[in-house]
Amino acid sequence: MNIRKRTGEVVPFQEEKILNAMKKAFSGQGQEIDDRVLDEMLSVVLKRLPENSGLTVERVQDEVERVLMECGHYEVAKAYILYREKRAALRRVRADLAREVGDDALEDLLRQIQKDFEEEVYPLSALQLKFESFCKPAMTTDAKMEALTKAAVELTTVEAPKWEFIAARLLNHTFSKRNASWWTERGVKGLYEKLRYLTDKGLYGDYILARYSREEIDTAEGFLCPKRDTLFTYSGLDLLLKRYVIQSRSREPLETPQEMFLGIALHLAMNETSGRMDWVRRFYDMLSRMEVTMATPTMSNARKPHHQLSSCFIDTVPDSLDGIYRSVDNFAKVSKFGGGMGLYFGKVRATGSAIRGFQGAAGGVIRWIRLVNDTAVAVDQLGMRQGAVAVYLDAWHKDLPEFLQLRTNNGDDRMKAHDVFPAVCYPDLFWKLAEKNLDAPWQLMCPHEILTVKGYALEDYWGEEWEKRYLDCVSDPRIEKRTVTVKDIVRLVLRSAVETGTPFAFNRDTVNRMNPNGHAGMIYCSNLCTEIAQNMAPIEHISTEVRTENGDTVVVTATRPGEFVVCNLASLSLGNLPVEDEAYLERTVETAIRALDNVIDLNFYPLEYARLTNHKYRSIGLGVSGYHHMLAKRGIRWESEEHLAFADAVFERINYAAIRADTALAREKGCYALFEGSDWQTGAYFEKRGYTSGKWRELAETVAAQGMRNAYLLAIAPTSSTSILSGTTAGIDPVMRRFFLEEKKGSILPRVAPELSLDTWWYYKAAHLIDQSWSVRAAGVRQRHIDQAQSMNLYITNDYTMRQVLALYLDAWRSGVKTIYYIRSKSLEVEDCESCAS
């Protein structure tokens, strides 16, 4: 027997649905009913139903009402009648909305929205009322859909935060219809034909179809799960469609969100030799479930012709005209393809230093930094956004006072560089003096003068050896000093930090002490977002010679490539992962590590120096986002010992899983070139971090025997953009506010803490209200398990004194925190890095 639904669809009749409806009617009135009695009533209902094709849902419900009344269940029958009327009202409002918009397909979507959002604060009647206030005569259907979506966005409140998910579904409905129509007009069907079209138009890299057969693409198409589009918030989907999916040259989005995730997966699995399609599926699943996000360049550029997948690069600027201009040129090429940059200026001679024996000839680092600043502005990625660069200088460099005023508003504008991000590299000695005696003298010196007089570069040392040599330089009368007090430097640092959010802080001795590859080099500074800590070395000029090749005269310049650091980033979305499930977490980490390792071999490098270093060390940076989200949904307060204990357990779990996955990958594909002699190989890595349990000792033995695939593993990036995509909190930061409205290009965007509810409300304490000492302690706890660094911000209010801010720096240093990113004053707006937004 069949039954006709209200939509007109004829489906098989299922009597258990009647039984369930009657059960719900009784339970809704708080009454229990014997199954035997229910069966008897069901039998009566069934006898009264027609056996011909005229059976409808309405007829069945009419009979249920009558039987309930006849059996004396008047209150239940009354509730059932009211329930039917409520359902009828729901049907009317969605039918009215679909008719008003002029989109018949909209009704099915609205029906699903009513089913998924049953709470009273999400009535479609409210959406209809808001929509009608936006609606104007003669609006097109597309304009009406935009108005409907805008209505849902503006209904998002603290009390009803899920409207942002409803708005996302409406936006996706509009996009999907338009996208399907675009492809239909061109006669393109199926994923393979889409990829062929995009490849022919130069929008998709031809390497995808060259490496995958049609059968494999068809198999991959079967992995697509459009239902996962419902995981998006409005902000996330809007950002993805505007910035991440492949667009036509007229800025029309051509990929669906799921096709984007699959395209990235196809790219990242391209070189797999065993079980390749299984890896495609695993990569696709981790991305589309929003359990892992790749860095913004990987998300944007994987599958494209110019697939620059790395976030950030670090260069050591040499102390020569050729070397400085080479570094600036390198920055321009990196910026051209969307990468951010970290530049270490600690080797460049100070103002007044000698050039070729001419005393006082050097102009110092500021003029070169201004050149970098102008390059950042000039190379603006086809007008999309200007380049981004952090410039690092040592705390004992003679030009430090001027450097600390690069971005402040007061002073000589010829000494300013407002578009770079300054950062200071601090030795332990500086913090020891700041802790004990702020009035202690602090000597600033020129690195070139030290090299000339002493025969060594002071910046090439760290720890006790650096301190011994620094004091030796201080006592050497041949070296000119610029004497200040520690307080003078601290005051300049804090004044700039409060006013501009910078300089970033880099604790060089802590970094190098915990460097697992200290046997192979030195870490001078970090990257644009302060999460990368890898060995560095300047590019060196060897020779320039004139040759004749094929009858032509050519000039050949030879250089030693140095170590030009590359950041390959991804982040675990902790708020979306069951972090207590060790097996699930291990599998997710294993998948992410493999994807990152593949980035190294599949990347388009803007510079050969970057390619050489990346293949030498095979460094990656797996980080996290959704940290506050993770805590809040588990009812853990930020300012609590429970937070510290939980973070310690989670990050130890992540680190263990990462090392285990990486050594297994080394067994399969081989070690990085410099594994021998590293802390990984000697076991010092595990000893320094107090990993002494049985399972850690066993893992250390496995690592020593099998090796490591990647020299560096973990680094926590800011994830400012990709955390929006995945609907979670950024990086390791607390939320700025539980809820606020952001105006962008004339529209209002709601920003809601993830899974905000009465249960999570009290655990989402705003960043500026949190006692920052808890954030510093948490960073120290996490740092033990992170071989690189963390993009950690400090949030201060106008009530903070300079001494309180200094205390946070000192606490961070004592806790073993390697870097501090922005000092975010409540009244200060700072720029987030796009490149490291993993």
PLM regions and their residue ranges:
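Core nucleic-acid recognition elements
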Residues: E9, E32-L262, D278-Y284
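Core structural elements
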Residues: R66-M69, M139, E154, F232-R243, ...
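Terminal amphipathic helices with adjacent charged low-complexity linkers/tails
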Residues: A79-V93, W163-L195, Y426, N512-P538, ...
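Long, structured ligand/cofactor-binding scaffold of large enzymes
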Residues: D142, A147, R178-W183, D229-V377
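Active-site cavity-forming subdomains of large catalytic enzyme subunits
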Residues: T174-K227, S310-S571, P578-V579, Y605-Y609, ...
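Catalytic alpha/beta core of large soluble enzyme barrels
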Residues: S213-E221, C225, D229-D238, T530-Q534, ...
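Gly/Pro-rich turn-and-neighbor structural signature
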Residues: E252-D322, R469-S496, T500-A505, F651-E701
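Internal maturation/activation junctions in enzymes
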Residues: M286, V328, T588-R611, S619, ...
